[in-house]
Swiss-Prot record:
Pfam families (UniProt xref): 2Fe-2S_thioredx
Subunit composition and interactions: Composed of 13 different subunits. Subunits NuoCD, E, F, and G constitute the peripheral sector of the complex.
Binding-site residues, [2Fe-2S] cluster: 92, 97, 133, 137
Keyword flag Iron-sulfur: yes
Keywords of this entry: 2Fe-2S, Iron, Iron-sulfur, Metal-binding, NAD, Quinone, Translocase, Ubiquinone
Swiss-Prot/TrEMBL cofactor(s): [2Fe-2S] cluster
Enzyme class, UniProt record, top EC level: translocase
Protein name listed in UniProt: NADH-quinone oxidoreductase subunit E
Amino acid sequence: MSQSNLIQTDRFVLSETERSSIEHEMHHYEDPRAASIEALKIVQKQRGWVPDGAIPAIGEVLGIPASDVEGVATFYSQIFRQPVGRHIIRVCDSMVCYIGGHESVVGEIQKQLGIGLGQTTADGRFTLLPVCCLGNCDKAPALMIDDDTHGDVRPDGVAKLLEAYV
């Protein structure tokens, strides 16, 4: 097999669903760059994360440089650039949550799951990520699991909280 054939067969390809959804979304914006975040969300929804190869493929559909898509993908913390677990735990590490007991809650989550921040459990069930602020300062320390916000989290309640996401 020639090198050019190898490159062609290994090239990332958007699914027809992804491509048509991105093209549809693109028509809602005057500037195709504005559709890049939606395009990234489309790929992530289909695949669970955004592989490196998706960046130039999205750029090609939108007619913009891959570097523009990359800039958006790296800016937004909700775009995952590596595989993540079925459930995403986002722990707030703002000053208010830190003072409210963030470290002990994170420590208990790490102990229960056997992972550190930025890691995924071996069974692919959970990914643990820090976030700057969840806007739930009146209930610090706070965390989110998927789309559910939990406030006033205490270390002794972590096991029960995690069990709800089996």
